[in-house]
Amino acid sequence: MITNYKYKPTVYFILAFAITWINGFIIAVQSHQGVDKNIIFLLLAYMGPYIAALIMMFVFCDKDFRADFRKRIYNLRLIKKNYIPFTLFFLPITMVISILISIVFGQPSEQLRFAEEFKIFNGEVILSMIILVLVPLLEELGWRGYGVDSLASKFNLFRTSMIFGVLWGVWHLPAFFMKNSYQSSLWGQHPLFAVNFFVGIIPLAIIMNYLYYRNRRSIFLIALFHILVNYSSELFEANQISKCIFTLLLSVVAVIIVIRNKSFFFQDKMIEV
């Protein structure tokens, strides 16, 4: 762990948001003009957190910081074995439970079917599949490569998770303006479903940061968990009622984790500088 580096969270998040939002809103405007998605703008938008992290590392950090970053990507020995089952199975099991609860309350049982296609971008199956895998990896190289640690150098883990959860949610804003995107479809169904998207990120941030710091800041583990977040949401024909229940269950689990690990979440700082 890098203990003698002064993190610059404000600079980092301004860079990450600027890169993502500039390119993201360009795509949003083009999508309403009938222009095909420009893969360069799309990649730059999703790579905002990672590009910002690279800028911070090469402008403000030394070789030891960069070596630590590389180690946290590739070194699987950072991962504690007892966290692997939770990482792999928690999200899909929670989604199935959410669907079952919704069925009890009258929602269609067809939700338990495997989805015929992924719905990140309607009608663009291959692009959606790539995004489901590639984007979580690119995000986590930035968020856990620099962003979350920069917040954890200033705040305890609970405040870090709450602040990051809000920032992470707002970071997705351009997607809500892209025609045929999953996020834009939420508004069309009901504003509550769009609100649920943002609310659900908060407990997710708590759970992910807990895993991250319990596993010696392994970027690999959190990237895998993030990929499973996306796949669990798209694997079944789950409707938005089930996804609201999913958010509720995530919140319950996040609260339990915080209560059972109070000293871990409320110690002064996760990273001393």
Regions found by a protein language model. Give the residues of each.
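Membrane-interface helix/loop boundary segments of multi-pass membrane proteins
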Residues: 138-170, 213-218
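Membrane-interface interhelical connector segments
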Residues: 142-149, 178-189
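Alpha-helical transmembrane segments and their helix-entry boundary regions
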Residues: 9-13, 83-84, 146, 160-161, ...
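Functionally important transmembrane alpha-helices
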Residues: 186-251
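Specific transmembrane helices
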Residues: 2-136, 164, 196, 234-273
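Transmembrane alpha-helix/helix-exit interface in multi-pass inner-membrane proteins
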Residues: 95-103, 140, 159-181
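Hydrophobic/aromatic residues in alpha-helical transmembrane segments
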Residues: 97, 147, 204-208
